């Protein structure tokens, strides 16, 4: 099965070349697929199945017209699958426009309330960012997602946390696909300890082990709150959900209590003492190699170079992620500089790559 990925932020030329050879499955972002339709470099007239995944996210990001254009380029006789975590009016409109006599399947969000410990803290609106640092210094989770309601707040909070010594990155809409990939790779391989994100940008993010979720702002949508905290406490792990609430947000907390059929538990920020040591550093560092699948680079090639010429052990090498043109490898923090120097002056699979 030949699969092609068409995303914005990647060179158009190689995508056009790949499309000329055809594909069984195309996975892409609405904007880039619409660009290819406009250029005449993609033909959707024989599409049998159209999947609109994370539909609410795409609509929130302003892609409704692009989606409509893609649907119009597909044959009328087709199977269309629309997936959405929420079902607001815009998605009802999309369903009516893009689907014919659809069958609706609804899966209720379910989380083991005993597996996720929820703690609520009252803060002033201006004190949120300082409170996030206070929570991180006290609980010291290895990996945390901090949810903000706006991208501006995401950027501000991530910058403040970095200034205080935390390894923090911001994830929000309007990032290029390459930027998003780099951020997600670093968070997934534990090179970044705190991911500050909007709900829209964090959709589809799958991190198996997450130490904590911090709700920097209380969500007005109870289902969104449940989706947020459900990212921690997966499998058999215990989860920790920490929510900051300004006085004017208590009405939203009341909705959460109604949904959960029970009161939330409040705690006092003033009682939190910093744990020993300074801000928790991410245990890993990510190296970026300017080569990927198009260069026939494989994870085993990089692992061989690191454990061979560089002299690292397998335990000092973390996750290796190979993309079309880039490769990312997580290394134990204390070995990263040595590995960077060795690889910069050495070779991988008999070839030199920029780092």
Features from the language model and the residues they span:
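Conserved helicase RecA-like core
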Residues: 1-355
């Amino acid at each position: 099965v030949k699969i092609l990925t068409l995303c914005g932020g990647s060179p158009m030329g190689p995508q056009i070349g790949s499309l000329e050879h055809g594909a069984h499955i195309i996975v892409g972002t609405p904007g880039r697929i619409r660009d290819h339709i406009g250029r005449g470099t993609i033909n959707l007239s024989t599409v049998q199945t159209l999947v609109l995944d994370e539909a609410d996210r795409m609509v929130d990001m302003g892609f409704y017209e692009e989606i409509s254009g893609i649907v119009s380029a597909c044959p009328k006789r087709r199977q269309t699958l629309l997936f959405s975590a929420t079902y607001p009016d815009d998605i009802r409109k999309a369903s009516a426009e893009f689907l014919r006599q659809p069958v609706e399947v609804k899966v209720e969000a379910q989380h083991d309330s005993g597996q996720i410990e929820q703690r609520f803290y009252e803060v002033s609106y201006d004190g949120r960012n300082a409170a996030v640092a206070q929570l991180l210094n006290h609980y010291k989770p290895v990996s945390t997602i901090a949810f903000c309601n706006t991208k501006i707040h995401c950027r501000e909070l991530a910058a403040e946390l970095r200034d205080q010594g935390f390894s923090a990155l911001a994830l929000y809409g309007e990032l290029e696909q390459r930027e998003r990939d780099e951020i997600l790779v670093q968070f997934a391989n534990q090179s970044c300890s705190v991911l500050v994100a909007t709900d829209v940008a964090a959709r589809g993010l799958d991190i198996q082990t997450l130490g904590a979720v911090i709700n920097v702002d209380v969500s007005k949508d109870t289902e969104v709150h449940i989706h947020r905290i459900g990212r921690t406490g997966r499998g058999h792990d215990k989860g920790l959900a920490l929510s900051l609430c300004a006085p004017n947000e208590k009405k939203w907390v009341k909705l959460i209590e109604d949904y959960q059929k029970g009161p939330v538990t409040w705690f006092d920020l003033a009682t939190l003492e910093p744990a020993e040591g300074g801000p928790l550093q991410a245990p890993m560092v990510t190296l970026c190699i300017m080569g990927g699948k198009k260069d026939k680079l494989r994870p085993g090639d990089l692992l061989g170079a690191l454990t061979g010429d560089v002299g690292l052990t397998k335990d000092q090498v973390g996750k290796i992620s190979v993309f079309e043109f880039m490769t990312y490898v997580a290394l134990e923090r204390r070995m990263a500089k040595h590995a960077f120097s060795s690889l910069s002056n050495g070779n991988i699979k008999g070839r030199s790559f920029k780092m």
